[in-house]
Amino acid sequence: MGILSQTSAPVYEALERFRKKRVVPFDVPGHKRGRGNPELRELLGEKCVNLDVNSMKPLDNLCHPVSVIRDAEELAAEAFGAAHAFFMVGGTTSSVQSMVLSSCKAGDKIILPRNVHKSVINALVLNGAIPVYINPQVDSKLGISLGMEIGEVAKAIKANPDATAVLVNNPTYYGICSDLRSIVKLAHEHNMLCLVDEAHGTHFYFGKNMPVNAMAAGADMASVSMHKSGGSLYLSWKEKTCADGSLLWE
């Protein structure tokens, strides 16, 4: 590929080139670019089903990207201010689990709010890491849980100086943000990683007057969801990492 810029769309452009070749498919998916399922073609449109194709050399492979997917990940990392970006399948759940599984091992402690997504708990079950919960305050008027107070994070770190990481929701499901910069700083001062579940904060990277995003705050890893708040189709995610870390992208 030529020089990359933020106006480039490597994967889409590769799909368009492939579509124009009028390849006759003998592989998956079974609808054979709409030929085998006219009802689906009528519902989604011929162009859409023509682009629903399997991994092959012109389109790269997500398991080991070497061309257009790699280029797209590099552009994503640049756009989000991360050192690396990784496109994921399996929802932001898989991105969050990747962060936890790659940061903690059996017996390691991880400090996190009680209102984390269940994907975090699933990851702890898988790898045997030990949760150290911080109970967020509840807004009595709205009836919703708030973010992690920096004082409570400091107490948890003091009581568990051997913890490996701190995980933060940015924002919570209700749009509540913690003091992310201060939490990142505190975690790093105690040689702990800071992981951020940013499933509902993709827009923080591009909007004006937005709360600070994970990469700007110096977090080590963050998981963002492009479909929840980034405007893409359902089930598109990413993981990213900071200057010396990575980004997981759903």
Positions of PLM-derived features:
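Conserved N-terminal alpha-helix of the aminotransferase class I/II PLP-enzyme fold
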Residues: E46-S94
